Amino acid sequence: MACTKTLQQSQPISAGATTTTTAVAPAGGHSGSTECDLECLVCREPYSCPRLPKLLACQHAFCAICLKLLLCVQDNTWSITCPLCRKVTAVPGGLICSLRDHEAVVGQLAQPCTEVSLCPQGLVDPADLAAGHPSLVGEDGQDEVSANHVAARRLAAHLLLLALLIILIGPFIYPGVLRWVLTFIIALALLMSTLFCCLPSTRGSCWPSSRTLFCREQKHSHISSIA
């Protein structure tokens, strides 16, 4: 009698355990299916705008890229064979875009994502950058001065060539007064370009600017502090 009572008590416990396991199993299966619904079953890539989920006639969904690879001609029609159930789906004109989208997955893809705000803390004011690195400003100034010297020399060469042409061709084309006026104007422009070309370069080469001296002093102090 004791054995029969023990068996009768153990049967409800085991039945409750089975019901618990069966109740828990669908929940786990549903979460796994939800994760699988968000990625293609062929390439295992998550759905996105280039990989839109497309439904076949068998209601199985795959990404558009995999369906393009599975597209073939059967009986003179474009069709796709489902990789899961092997059911054939006709594709009008061979256009994957003609297939219906998986609305549930597309709705999840259309949900707005949290935007990450970037704070450009590394950006500083150009004035602060110039104050922190005066050597860069000095180099830029020297480059501008050298470019101005080159432009002035080219202008002087062009004006000299123009003056020579006027002196050579002027007696045959222009009268005396106009010829001398043009010659005077070109000579004055040539003199000004020569002054702009020569004087700043000699001054800059002989006398260094205060900014250059300040940069050198900072370099020497920086080297001494490191030593």
UniProtKB/Swiss-Prot annotation:
It is a multi-pass membrane protein. Its EC number is 2.3.2.27. It is an enzyme of class 2 (transferase). GO terms for molecular function: ubiquitin protein ligase activity; ubiquitin protein ligase binding; ubiquitin-protein transferase activity; zinc ion binding. Its main location: endoplasmic reticulum. Changing residue 64 to T: Exhibits a reduced ability to ubiquitinate EPHB2 but retained ability to ubiquitinate EPHB3. The keyword Ribonucleoprotein does not apply. The chain crosses the membrane at residues 158-178, 180-200. It comes from the Eukaryota. PANTHER family: E3 UBIQUITIN-PROTEIN LIGASE RNF186, RING-TYPE DOMAIN-CONTAINING PROTEIN. This is E3 ubiquitin-protein ligase RNF186. It comes from Homo sapiens.
